[in-house]
Amino acid sequence: MTIQTLFAASHHIYLGNALWYLICFAILLLLIKHFAWGPVSDMMEKRRQKVINDLDSAASDRKKAETLANEREAALKNSRQEATQILSDAKANAQKTGKEIVASANEDAAAIRKKANEEAAKAKSDALDSARDQVADISLAIAEKVIAKNLSAEDQKDLVDQFIKELDD
């Protein structure tokens, strides 16, 4: 057998074999369609629905996250405004309290000065009265001594005793 004979025999198509292959292929397609195509198609549909649901869920979650972020931003802004207001109120109260304390201290100082001036004036008046009394007593004592020179010894003794007695009282 030559190469040409082998080559010619290999190109020869057998109609019976081709028909048999065609029937087997058709049966195989029917079996695949009946047993595998439905489950594969169902699996692909489920996968498609899952992808769609996941995309919808992701979009919904993104919107929720944006809403939550906006709410938190608004709450943070509100908190900052409240903090600023609280600080402003605290400063105003501190200034008011400081002014009240200074005014009260000034009033207390004025009252203390007034009381000190009154006490000083009273002490001065008492000192002057005491000095007058002492000057009067000294003058009287001097006058008595001058008069005592003209008195007898017994009159002088009585006068001294009387003077000492008056000092004790």
UniProtKB/Swiss-Prot annotation:
Q: Which NCBIfam families match?
A: ATP_synt_b
Protein name as catalogued = ATP synthase subunit b
Q: Name one GO cellular component term.
A: plasma membrane
Question: Which GO molecular-function terms appear in the entry?
Answer: proton-transporting ATP synthase activity, rotational mechanism; proton-transporting ATPase activity, rotational mechanism
Which family does the record assign?
Belongs to the ATPase B chain family.
The gene behind this protein is atpF
Q: What does this protein do?
A: F(1)F(0) ATP synthase produces ATP from ADP in the presence of a proton or sodium gradient. F-type ATPases consist of two structural domains, F(1) containing the extramembraneous catalytic core and F(0) containing the membrane proton channel, linked together by a central stalk and a peripheral stalk. During catalysis, ATP synthesis in the catalytic domain of F(1) is coupled via a rotary mechanism of the central stalk subunits to proton translocation. Component of the F(0) channel, it forms part of the peripheral stalk, linking F(1) to F(0).
Topology versus the membrane, per the UniProt entry?
Single-pass membrane protein
* Compartment(s) of residence: Cell membrane
Output the CDD domains linked to this UniProt entry.
ATP-synt_Fo_b
Q: Which HAMAP family match?
A: ATP_synth_b_bprime
What keywords were assigned to this record? ATP synthesis, Cell membrane, CF(0), Hydrogen ion transport, Ion transport, Membrane, Transmembrane, Transmembrane helix, Transport
Q: What is its main location?
A: membrane
Record's subunit section: F-type ATPases have 2 components, F(1) - the catalytic core - and F(0) - the membrane proton channel. F(1) has five subunits: alpha(3), beta(3), gamma(1), delta(1), epsilon(1). F(0) has three main subunits: a(1), b(2) and c(10-14). The alpha and beta chains form an alternating ring which encloses part of the gamma chain. F(1) is attached to F(0) by a central stalk formed by the gamma and epsilon chains, while a peripheral stalk is formed by the delta and b chains.
Alphabetical list of InterPro entries matching this protein: ATP_synth_b/b'su_bac/chlpt (IPR002146), ATP_synth_F0_bsu_bac (IPR005864), ATP_synthase_B_chain (IPR050059)
List the Pfam families hit by this protein, alphabetically: ATP-synt_B
Q: Which organism is it from?
A: Lactobacillus helveticus (strain DPC 4571)
